Amino acid sequence: MAVKIKLTRLGKIRNPQYRVAVADARTRRDGRAIEVIGRYHPKEEPSLIEINSERAQYWLSVGAQPTEPVLKLLKITGDWQKFKGLPGAQGRLKVAAPKPSKLEVFNAALAAADGGPTTEATKPKKKSPAKKAAKAAEPAPQPEQPDTPALGGEQAELTAES
């Protein structure tokens, strides 16, 4: 059976996301896969490429043929060089810089503006006094009494006695 390592498409229009999948060569692009060994998101900066190196090495060793786009991804991650015994097995994958936490950014902005935070970053919301006063001034609605008494239970006995 001819096995290929190929990309199966996910995502929305104009936002492609791919799975790196091992599948029979005769299956369609998004058809049934034998195994999913990674994912690829080209729209992120830098592109997200996650490939399980151990499983990729296994499938290459048993004769699976990568498609051209997958071959480029394997060269970027260094899996193809490792399989072929070529130099550069560490790959040239770009890593995104870690994002600073929002609290750190907030405190840094406060420090730059006034010289330091005067209060906590998170404070519970309080209701405005105008709304509280309006609710207190409004009388509570009284439940309306029905004009005709219900004829059931004890009330039926009371009306029968009178």
Curated annotation (Swiss-Prot):
What keywords tag this UniProt record?
A: Ribonucleoprotein, Ribosomal protein
* UniProt biased composition (Basic residues): 124-134
- Region annotation Disordered: residue ranges? 113-162
Q: Name one GO biological process term.
A: translation
Q: Could you confirm whether the keyword Membrane appears in this record? A: no
Indicate whether Protein biosynthesis appears among the record's keywords: no
User: GO molecular-function annotation terms?
Assistant: structural constituent of ribosome
The family database entries (PROSITE patterns) matched by this protein are listed as: RIBOSOMAL_S16
A GO CC annotation given for this chain: plasma membrane
InterPro entries assigned: Ribosomal_bS16 (IPR000307), Ribosomal_bS16_CS (IPR020592), Ribosomal_bS16_dom_sf (IPR023803)
> One Pfam family, short name please?
Ribosomal_S16
Q: NCBIfam families in the record, alphabetically?
A: PRK14520.1, S16
Q: Which HAMAP family match?
A: Ribosomal_bS16 (MF_00385)
What is stated as this protein's family in its record? Belongs to the bacterial ribosomal protein bS16 family.
What is the official name of this protein in its record?
Small ribosomal subunit protein bS16
Q: Which organism is it from?
A: Mycobacterium tuberculosis (strain ATCC 25618 / H37Rv)
